Amino acid sequence: MAQSPMISVPLKATNEIDWVEPLKRYIRDTYGDDPERYAEECATLNRLRQDVRGAGKDSTSGRDMLYRYYGQLELLDLRFPVDEQHIKISFTWFDAFTHKSTAQYSLAFEKASIIFNISAVLSCHAAAQDRGEESALKTAYHNFQASAGMFTYINENFLHAPSSDLSRETVKALIHVMLAQAQEVFLEKQVADKKKPALLAKLASQAGYLYSQALEGVQENVTKAIFEKVWLLMTQIKSNLLNSMAQYYQALADEEQDKHGIAVGRLQTAETQAKEAERVARSFPNSVPMSSNLSADCGGFLQELTKRHLSTVQSQLQSALKDNDYIYHKEVPAEASLEAVAKLPAAKPIPVSELYAGQDIQRITGPDLFAKIVPFAVTESASLYDEEKAKLVRAEAERVDTANGEMAASLDYLRLPGALQVLKGGFDQDILPDEDFRQWCEDVSDQENPVTLFDSLRTEKDSILSILDKSTKQLDMEEGVCEKMRSKYENEWTQQPSSRLTTTLRGDIRHYREALDEASRSDNQLAGKLRQNEMDFDEMRRAAKSGEADQLFQRAVAQARARGSNATSPAGLEPNLLDDDFDEGPSVIDQINRVEDILKKLNSIKRERNQVLKDLKEKAHNDDISQILILNKKSISNYEAQLFEQELEKFRPHQNRLLQANHKQSALMKELTSAFNRLLQDKRVQSEQSKYETIQRQRSSVINRYKRAYQEFLDLVAGLQSAKNWYAEMRETVESLEKNVDSFVNNRRSEGAQLLNQIEQERSSNKNSQAEMERERLRGLMDRMSMDPNKSSPQPQQNRPTPPSQYQQSQAPRYPQTNYQGQYQQPNSPPPQQAQQQAYQNFSPPPTTTTTQSFGPPPINTFVQPTYNPSQYGRTPGPTSPPPNQTSFNIGGYRGPASPPPNQSTFGQSQSFGGYGASSTPQTQGGYVPPGFVPPPPPPGPPPLGPQQTFHYGNQPNSAHPNSAYPQSAMPPQQQQQQQQQQQNDPWAGLNAWK
């Protein structure tokens, strides 16, 4: 059976354009991004544009291709302004009917043309369906409505049409044609389903009405030479045919209602309209223009359709007239007096948003090509939205924290759930110590036993005292030998008294002894602390080594309980409270279970609340409305706050759940407080509570005891370590003092030996001098008795000149004064290098080679040890003591043998000096050093800071920092060997045995 032909809209043609370069240029200039990053996206868009030029007009693939490109244009318009001022691209399209070209730089023109082609493709696809099949008929019905919807979108959104095919009049006419054809297709389906004539009449009446509306627009466009004339003929045929069908089916409905006269009148009207349709169909040309988009046999189909309908109407009219004339005799009304047939719309424009109803639009349009590019305005709006989200999350988090804090505070005030554990399980678990106690025992065990430390300190102190005793004995022995020699030789013994030279050394020894006394007192304090806590220390040490810290704690608690005035039985023997339910009312176990149930509910609410908050934070973090903001970019400024409020509503369920959790918690906390108070008021619970508090006090007392012992142990270990360091530093100091004493004694012994040798030589020389003088006197007498006047008495010559003693007052650095405060402190002594510089600022370090005796001035840069050198104080001709006010040696200025003055107490710093030898002949001033002489080290510094000691340093010239280490002197091995050899040949060495 031939089906009614349908009108389809031709597609607009277009020229090729280039999207790539303009887009890249705009990305680089406006967004400041590398355009090559978007090369693929630009190429994809350009390829879509090329594909739409060849889109098929009668297939769904062509429709999808056009829609995909249109969707990308919509997304592109949200990021790129395509117009004459920004991205300038000329879009050229040809009119679908007149084929005239139109070029514009507006993206709206490009989108309108694409939508027009989508509508055209939909109409072509609908017209090409074989409506004999139900699925094809439904497709045609849907596509005609969708085409009308797309044309409606053009009319509503593109107001200024640049071409005639996009004008409002043309598009409106096309909308009516598409809707009329959709209504006709629906009517065909109802006719095929043999629906009631009344329904068919209404559907046909609506179709005829739509064709009549379309006829006006088509007539106007044909007049303007836009549409082909065959469209006008076809619209006229369809209008008359559908109106005739409406009258025909309404007549059948009237006959069913016994309205035979009215039925005859309607059939007569239907015949008139059918004849008019047949007449126009006969005038339809056999060949149609290509631009009309109609098939070549369209005219034949229309003629056959109208002829068949006219035959049907005439046959029914004859039958109705016959029946009415012979049977019913009803009056036949005139055509003008007939009521209009009611209309039933069955077709309406399908909006663009419903074009792909039930399908994945994202799959058809594809992903947003330029999703990585976000406009600045959208970024700002997204930031504002993020801040709104953050406010919401912060507010909910604060509510959750507040609720959790209130729960924790209430449970802590009620001492739950710990109190329940005590009531249920007794006190066994409370006798166990905490982890701190175990750690205290481990720390005590890891440290060295204080008793061992005390023994080592005592040994160290005894060693230091023995060194000081030895040094004192050496100084006393040297002083005794010197005074015995002075008593023997009287004025001839010119060596400086030792007591004036050993003031500093003896003072240091005295100070060191005092420091040791102070240290002993501090040691006694530490020992007292050890005696007081030694038992606890030993217990903790043994418990840690044997792994019995818990048993130690339990024994201590048991002892504390036994010492109590009201001692109770051990916890293990306490009757269980849960087994002792003898009062009336609810049992204790029931009350405890009730409280535990409430606690479980509270904990469940807390977990649920925390989880809801976590989900809320995660959802807010993942919530990104950038795409929504982009889609609404053009209107976001008008309703931004409204959009934010709408989007934040998605978090409302989480907020409601948190609010409900808080309400539940408040109710449960009230119930918990009431139930727990009733439990505590039970006499059985009160009795056990009193016992528990007693045990807790005992446990706390044990904890405090061992905590105090542990703190005492830490203090003791710290004090012993400080004492150990102090004694080690003190030992270094007294060893340095011992070396200085040895050097001083050796130097004095060498000086005394030279002085003794000189005295013996002078006595021998004096005897020879008296004999010579006697001979000279006799010779003089003989000369006077002689008669020769040329002879004269010779003048006696002085055998040796007496060099003037030269003293230069030099200022030697003094030891800093010491203030003893009785506390162990780290000694602040100058380091060896600084102390060496303090004593010998003008000299280089001594050479390690053996020093030989030399006469004459030393060469330049030759080291001359600035120390106390006995060879420089020989009797030439006799000793000359320094002035009484001299307090230090001036080594660089002596020209004769002289001991330090009586009041000198330190070795001075001075320049290099010259000395005289043992010979009676004058010697050139030079650096004479006797064989084997070992220069003594600088005097020692103050003792280390002992108990209650604090050094106070004044402003001393050329002094080192007070925190420096003590100086240490060392004697080269070769010099020690030479000194031993000299002592073997020392004639004064035997004087050491004097008593």
Swiss-Prot record:
<comment type="function">
    <text>Involved in concentration and sorting of cargo proteins of the multivesicular body (MVB) for incorporation into intralumenal vesicles.</text>
</comment>
<comment type="similarity">
    <text>Belongs to the BRO1 family.</text>
</comment>
<dbReference type="InterPro" id="IPR025304">
    <property type="entry name" value="ALIX_V_dom"/>
</dbReference>
<feature type="region of interest" description="Disordered">
    <location>
        <begin position="755"/>
        <end position="995"/>
    </location>
</feature>
<feature type="compositionally biased region" description="Basic and acidic residues">
    <location>
        <begin position="772"/>
        <end position="786"/>
    </location>
</feature>
<feature type="compositionally biased region" description="Polar residues">
    <location>
        <begin position="789"/>
        <end position="818"/>
    </location>
</feature>
<feature type="domain" description="BRO1">
    <location>
        <begin position="5"/>
        <end position="407"/>
    </location>
</feature>
<feature type="compositionally biased region" description="Polar residues">
    <location>
        <begin position="904"/>
        <end position="925"/>
    </location>
</feature>
<dbReference type="Pfam" id="PF03097">
    <property type="entry name" value="BRO1"/>
</dbReference>
<feature type="coiled-coil region">
    <location>
        <begin position="720"/>
        <end position="786"/>
    </location>
</feature>
<feature type="compositionally biased region" description="Pro residues">
    <location>
        <begin position="932"/>
        <end position="946"/>
    </location>
</feature>
<dbReference type="InterPro" id="IPR004328">
    <property type="entry name" value="BRO1_dom"/>
</dbReference>
<keyword id="KW-0653">Protein transport</keyword>
<dbReference type="InterPro" id="IPR038499">
    <property type="entry name" value="BRO1_sf"/>
</dbReference>
<keyword id="KW-0967">Endosome</keyword>
<dbReference type="Pfam" id="PF13949">
    <property type="entry name" value="ALIX_LYPXL_bnd"/>
</dbReference>
<keyword id="KW-0813">Transport</keyword>
<protein>
    <recommendedName>
        <fullName>Vacuolar protein-sorting protein BRO1</fullName>
    </recommendedName>
</protein>
<feature type="compositionally biased region" description="Polar residues">
    <location>
        <begin position="948"/>
        <end position="973"/>
    </location>
</feature>
<feature type="compositionally biased region" description="Polar residues">
    <location>
        <begin position="862"/>
        <end position="874"/>
    </location>
</feature>
<dbReference type="GO" id="GO:0043328">
    <property type="term" value="P:protein transport to vacuole involved in ubiquitin-dependent protein catabolic process via the multivesicular body sorting pathway"/>
</dbReference>
<feature type="compositionally biased region" description="Low complexity">
    <location>
        <begin position="974"/>
        <end position="984"/>
    </location>
</feature>
<keyword id="KW-0963">Cytoplasm</keyword>
<dbReference type="GO" id="GO:0005768">
    <property type="term" value="C:endosome"/>
</dbReference>
<keyword id="KW-0175">Coiled coil</keyword>
